[in-house]
A protein has these predicted regions:
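RNA substrate-binding interface of SAM-dependent RNA methyltransferases
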Residues: 15-116
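N-terminal positively charged helical leader segments and presequences
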Residues: 1-18, 70
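Residues that form or immediately flank small-molecule/cofactor binding pockets and catalytic motifs
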Residues: 6, 16, 96, 120-123
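Active-site/ligand-binding-proximal alpha/beta "capping" segment
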Residues: 107-131
Length: 131
């Protein structure tokens, strides 16, 4: 601390550290959950387990749910602080699984990618193109 008054505090940074982001990305795609507390709980647990990005999408036959992105971002921020993460996960609200498939290919950069839906008829498996 350099100086401290009732209206301001001044400090000098003595030391700083940089923590590089892990090259291995872990993502999760979640379909719409009707109850808001369930999606919030799932986000919180996924952050604690080390997920780097989330897709939340509206499935064709699920009830339409409305999420406030700012609220979900706050859940992620809070869980990240609690689990002492240096990088905050990214939240992506997607319209469908096709968007997730394309975006995940771009993020994976040649890493094997498997996407599975909960219902057998909706299962989707994909791998990046062979080099």
């Amino acid at each position: 601390m350099v100086s401290l008054t009732k209206k301001e505090a001044q400090a000098v940074i003595v030391h700083s550290e940089s923590f590089p982001k892990s090259p291995a990305l872990r993502g999760v795609a979640m379909g719409s959950l009707h109850k808001k507390d369930r999606i919030e709980w799932a986000l919180e647990k996924a952050v604690e387990l080390g997920v780097d990005y989330f897709y939340i999408y509206q499935a064709d036959h699920s009830e339409r749910a409305r999420w406030k992105k700012s609220r979900l971002d706050q859940i992620i921020l809070s869980a990240s602080k609690q689990s002492k993460r240096t990088w905050f996960p990214e939240l992506i609200l997607a319209d469908n699984l096709e968007y997730i498939k394309q975006d995940a290919h771009q993020r994976s950069q040649g890493i094997d990618l498997n996407l599975w839906a909960a219902h057998e008829s909706a299962s989707l498996q994909t791998k990046p193109p062979e080099k």
